[in-house]
């Protein structure tokens, strides 16, 4: 029988390693595999804002599997049924968006664990994650290898951050800069000094609680700031944004800049 593969991303968090990631929003296994050959420590497959179906997520997991980059899946929301599907297709690390309270965090923890630790539905014999029933003691191994990250991205979540950090089974907390800045009254302005102060404070509080702290920064200078503040899993770009920037830059070499978008982009 096959042994369940370890979760190198989770091991990296435990060792307090700095892990650099990339956001995948293109929804294709082809682009996912290209990214996986680039050497990023982790790749976030986005099911919240990118139009990914569960089958799309499945194909991207397959494309990334032969490489060292570790996949993280962000589902559209943290419902028990959807979490069950995403785990069954082989995800070992989840980023759950819009977690505002400790009770929500506890519900997500329960949805990701098999009984008696939680309420994850049992279907190992038809699940890629269990090699279709070929992994001995799969349920216990799955509970152990699961890495759960929750996303804090609202004023309410900030008020409840300490309580969320106390929830057992949460491995890390990810700060969502776009929604957070909008919730704080600074839409599309995560660089505002007040937002920056809050982000720095949150990273410190997360690390002080013994959890991993994550962030997405499409601006390299902001990514460096977050790393200096103590964030230890940071995504430094979005595939679709990098693609559009490269397209526009190449076109600008041959056509007047007036015909090419020069708008500053943010996630």
UniProtKB/Swiss-Prot annotation:
Annotated GO CC locations: cytoplasm
Co-factor: note: Binds 1 Mg(2+) ion per subunit.
Annotated protein name in UniProt: 2-keto-3-deoxy-L-rhamnonate aldolase
Role description: Catalyzes the reversible retro-aldol cleavage of 2-keto-3-deoxy-L-rhamnonate (KDR) to pyruvate and lactaldehyde.
Residues annotated as binding substrate: 151, 178-179
Reactions performed catalytically: 2-dehydro-3-deoxy-L-rhamnonate = (S)-lactaldehyde + pyruvate
EC nos: 4.1.2.53
Source species: Salmonella typhi
Cofactor: Mg(2+)
Catalytic residues, chain numbering: 49
Chain positions recorded as Mg(2+) binding sites: 153, 179
Record InterPro entries: Aldolase/citrate-lyase_domain (IPR005000), HpcH-HpaI_aldolase (IPR050251), KDR_aldolase (IPR023593), Pyrv/PenolPyrv_kinase-like_dom (IPR015813), Pyrv_kinase-like_dom_sf (IPR040442)
Residues annotated as site: Increases basicity of active site His: 88
Family the UniProt entry places it in: Belongs to the HpcH/HpaI aldolase family. KDR aldolase subfamily.
Gene3D superfamilies recorded: Phosphoenolpyruvate-binding domains (3.20.20.60)
Name of the gene this protein is made from: rhmA
Lineage: Bacteria, Pseudomonadati, Pseudomonadota, Gammaproteobacteria, Enterobacterales
Gene Ontology molecular functions: 2-keto-3-deoxy-L-rhamnonate aldolase activity; magnesium ion binding
Keywords tagged on the record: Lyase, Magnesium, Metal-binding
Cystine crosslinks: none
Site (Transition state stabilizer): 74
Top-level class of the enzyme under EC nomenclature: lyase
Subunit structure: Homohexamer.
Xref: Pfam families: HpcH_HpaI
Family matches, as PANTHER family: 2-KETO-3-DEOXY-L-RHAMNONATE ALDOLASE (PTHR30502:SF5)
């Amino acid at each position: 029988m096959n042994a369940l593969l370890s979760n190198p991303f989770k091991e990296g968090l435990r060792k307090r390693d700095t892990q650099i990631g990339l956001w995948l929003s293109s929804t294709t296994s082809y682009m996912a595999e290209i990214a996986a050959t680039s050497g990023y420590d982790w790749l976030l497959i986005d099911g919240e804002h990118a139009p990914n179906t569960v089958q799309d997520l499945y194909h991207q997991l397959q494309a990334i599997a032969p490489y060292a980059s570790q996949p993280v899946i962000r589902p559209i929301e943290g419902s028990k049924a959807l979490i069950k599907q995403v785990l069954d297709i082989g995800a070992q690390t989840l980023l759950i968006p819009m977690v505002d309270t400790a009770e929500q965090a506890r519900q997500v923890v329960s949805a990701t664990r098999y009984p008696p630790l939680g309420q994850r539905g049992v279907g190992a014999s038809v699940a890629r994650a269990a090699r279709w029933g070929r992994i001995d003691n799969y349920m216990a191994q799955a509970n152990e290898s699961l890495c759960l990250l929750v996303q804090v991205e609202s004023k309410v979540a900030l008020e409840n951050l300490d309580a969320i950090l106390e929830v057992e089974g949460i491995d890390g907390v990810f700060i969502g800069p776009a929604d957070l800045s909008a919730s704080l009254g600074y839409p599309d302005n995560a660089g505002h000094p007040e937002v920056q102060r809050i982000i720095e404070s949150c990273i410190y509080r997360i690390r002080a609680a013994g959890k991993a702290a994550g962030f997405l920064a499409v601006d390299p200078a902001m990514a460096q700031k977050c790393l200096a503040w103590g964030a230890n899993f940071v995504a430094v770009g979005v595939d679709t944004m990098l693609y559009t920037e490269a397209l526009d830059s190449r076109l600008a070499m041959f056509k007047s800049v007036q015909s090419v978008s020069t708008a500053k982009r943010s996630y």
